[in-house]
Structures are given as structure tokens and as C-alpha cells.
Amino acid sequence: KKRRQRRRAAQAVRLIKFLYQSNPPPSPEGTRQARRNRRRRWRQRQRQIRSISGWIISNYLGRPAEPVPLQLPPLERLTLDCNEDCGTSGTQGVGSPQILVESPTILESGTKE
């Protein structure tokens, strides 16, 4: 089953790569208006390719192309807890996030420089 998943992922990547390669950036020749029109059409094709790529990913791999957004409390209530090794090399991003929902006094105290 894993081999089949890898093969389908490789197919999806090849298809998406082919789509992007089939739409090279527009040439810089011609009048300003012609260049503008070519760029506009190129951007429109890029948007279509992006949506088709999302469809390919969701159908080939069985998952949405975009990650589900993380629900956070209002910004005013978020503070960072740096009491423990904040950003020690090798440990960044490891473990559970240290987000506390408290008063914003910690953020205000760091404004002096």
C-alpha cells in the first residue's frame, strides 16, 4: 500500500511539474501594452494551474492541498513564555508550543531599547 501511495505521489508531482513547465514566463519583447497583456494572461494561466494542482493533490493523495487553518485566541490574549530555553540550538520547534493566554504585560515590558 505504501508503494502505491509513493507511486501516486510521484505521478502527482510529475503532472504538476509538467503543468508549470508548459506555461513559461512571458517574453519581454513588444510594446508596453503587449507585455502587460502577456503578463496578465500568464498570471491567469498560473492561477488555473494552481487550482488544477490542488485538485490533483486532493484526488491523487486523498488530502486537501491547503492545510487546515489553526484556530488561535485573539492576539491581545497571546504571550510567549520564554522562561525555559527559548531558542536553544537543536531544540527549536521540538515539543509542545509555549503559548500562554494571559495579560499582554509581558509584551509591553519589552518595548524599551
Swiss-Prot record:
Motif (Nuclear localization signal and RNA-binding (RRE)): 31-47
Single GO term (MF): RNA binding
Bias (Basic residues) ranges: 33-45
Described purpose of this protein according to its UniProt entry: Escorts unspliced or incompletely spliced viral pre-mRNAs (late transcripts) out of the nucleus of infected cells. These pre-mRNAs carry a recognition sequence called Rev responsive element (RRE) located in the env gene, that is not present in fully spliced viral mRNAs (early transcripts). This function is essential since most viral proteins are translated from unspliced or partially spliced pre-mRNAs which cannot exit the nucleus by the pathway used by fully processed cellular mRNAs. Rev itself is translated from a fully spliced mRNA that readily exits the nucleus.
Region (Disordered): 17-45, 89-113
Protein name: Protein Rev
Region (Homomultimerization): 15-23
Source domain of life: Viruses
GO biological process per UniProt: mRNA transport
InterPro entries: REV_protein
Domain free text: The RNA-binding motif binds to the RRE, a 240 bp stem-and-loop structure present in incompletely spliced viral pre-mRNAs. This region also contains the NLS which mediates nuclear localization via KPNB1 binding and, when the N-terminal sequence is present, nucleolar targeting. These overlapping functions prevent Rev bound to RRE from undesirable return to the nucleus. When Rev binds the RRE, the NLS becomes masked while the NES remains accessible. The leucine-rich NES mediates binding to human XPO1.
Subcellular location(s) per record: Host nucleus, Host nucleolus; Host cytoplasm
More info: HIV-1 lineages are divided in three main groups, M (for Major), O (for Outlier), and N (for New, or Non-M, Non-O). The vast majority of strains found worldwide belong to the group M. Group O seems to be endemic to and largely confined to Cameroon and neighboring countries in West Central Africa, where these viruses represent a small minority of HIV-1 strains. The group N is represented by a limited number of isolates from Cameroonian persons. The group M is further subdivided in 9 clades or subtypes (A to D, F to H, J and K).
Pfam families membership: REV
Family the UniProt entry places it in: Belongs to the HIV-1 REV protein family.
GO cellular component terms attached to this protein's record: host cell cytoplasm; host cell nucleolus
Modification after translation, per record: Asymmetrically arginine dimethylated at one site by host PRMT6. Methylation impairs the RNA-binding activity and export of viral RNA from the nucleus to the cytoplasm.
Complex formation: Homomultimer; when bound to the RRE. Multimeric assembly is essential for activity and may involve XPO1. Binds to human KPNB1, XPO1, TNPO1, RANBP5 and IPO7. Interacts with the viral Integrase. Interacts with human KHDRBS1. Interacts with human NAP1; this interaction decreases Rev multimerization and stimulates its activity. Interacts with human DEAD-box helicases DDX3 and DDX24; these interactions may serve for viral RNA export to the cytoplasm and packaging, respectively.
Keyword Phosphoprotein: yes
Short motif Nuclear export signal and binding to XPO1, span: 70-81
Keywords: AIDS, Host cytoplasm, Host nucleus, Host-virus interaction, Methylation, mRNA transport, Phosphoprotein, RNA-binding, Transport
HAMAP family tied to this protein: REV_HIV1
Residues the record lists as Phosphoserine modifications: S89, S96
